[in-house]
């Protein structure tokens, strides 16, 4: 095998169009991201049809910019990695069809990547010496998982949400208190002005050994609190609501992740996904893990949000295991972690 394996990666699962060139799964030569946040902000959330059209408009330019920034041509690429699920089906298809076209035209192998696996792999970019096994908390707008990474590309899901993802709950609560979209960063910001002990919102407790999550109850409790105060004409302190809600979510995420570490006897927790940029989650997880002697690894913001570099990292580890993807692959919007 060559000393350096160069992956051209493409990500388009939601509202970011991204392309990257990644060497040996850990060195990023380029990571171009065209965000659609300003487009969807006025709608209060991502509109799938609009997202697909925006991907189509920019994908060629984004891929070319990634190659140019890396000072590469397609001849320098060993394989093409692309997200094929989970995500919005129309958005996924744009990136997938583009990648399939490149693979067909160049004869380069295609490697389909699970978006969640990509988020986990972002940690290999930031932490060059990181090796499995370790625990990973994946928290984003669409996904919440506790994953035990046994080996490269080999996962065991120990806990997942039974309803809303953590990021989804953040977005809905932010909308309810008039903060708009995207909700996560806005709740994080306003919470710094509030009292996290002001309101006691419930935490889901399944009363058994499960490490699963449920955030719909917390979200509903916030909405009920707001409705009751409004009906009585009472003043609502949005900062207190945001801070108390955030603490409820973060406490559950941290508690379950530490329990998972203890159950598997691992001393490293990696964090992945857009919600990993939340300051309360970062501070609470680091503080509580320190008490247990557990190391916490959190990539920088650019690697927490959707990006193609993480897809390139995951694709590399698939490549060296000899895994290749047929050109007849289709988008799988509900793809499960570990499915191939």
Swiss-Prot record:
Which GO BP terms, alphabetically?
tRNA threonylcarbamoyladenosine modification
**A Pfam family assignment:** TsaD
Return the EC number.
2.3.1.234
Per UniProt, subcellular location reads as: Cytoplasm
- What are the names of the required cofactors? Fe(2+)
Record keyword Plastid present:
no
Q: Which UniProt keywords apply?
A: Acyltransferase, Cytoplasm, Iron, Metal-binding, Transferase, tRNA processing
Q: Sum up the protein's function in the record's words.
A: Required for the formation of a threonylcarbamoyl group on adenosine at position 37 (t(6)A37) in tRNAs that read codons beginning with adenine. Is involved in the transfer of the threonylcarbamoyl moiety of threonylcarbamoyl-AMP (TC-AMP) to the N6 group of A37, together with TsaE and TsaB. TsaD likely plays a direct catalytic role in this reaction.
Protein name as annotated: tRNA N6-adenosine threonylcarbamoyltransferase
Q: Which source organism? A: Clostridium botulinum (strain Loch Maree / Type A3)
